[in-house]
Amino acid sequence: GEAFTAVTEHFAQFVRPSTSIAGIEARGFIFASALANRMKTGFVPIRKAGKLPHAVFSQNYGLEYGTDILEIHVDAIPFAGEVLLIDDVLATGGTLDAAIKLVNRAGGSVYQIVALLEIQALEGRARLAAKYPQIPVHSLVVS
């Protein structure tokens, strides 16, 4: 609907030419795939362990209640490719940190993080800024 279109158009301002757009499972896929289609560029899925069909890089990350694993195809990103990383929620920053590491291992570099919602009290933005000061973070809604 109109809200989805407005979000996608807002996120489009962060896309550079020849950029790949990576989305983190599952709701990050919704915005990242739509934006990649709109901008006529590649979509890179970053998924939970065991869901991608061939050779992958894996990365453990912490959750409030334990740990999990994200994966990316080893050939998902053109060599030295720039990546716009999209997720639905920025909370502690753990998932996005793991995704950045995966993009780096796949030969790319994240130049921007975009989230639909940021939960400010969980300080994910501060953690990411301390670890990756060169990567700006944009959140559409901050609560």
Residue ranges and their predicted role:
Residues 1-86, 90-143:
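PRPP-associated nucleotide enzymes
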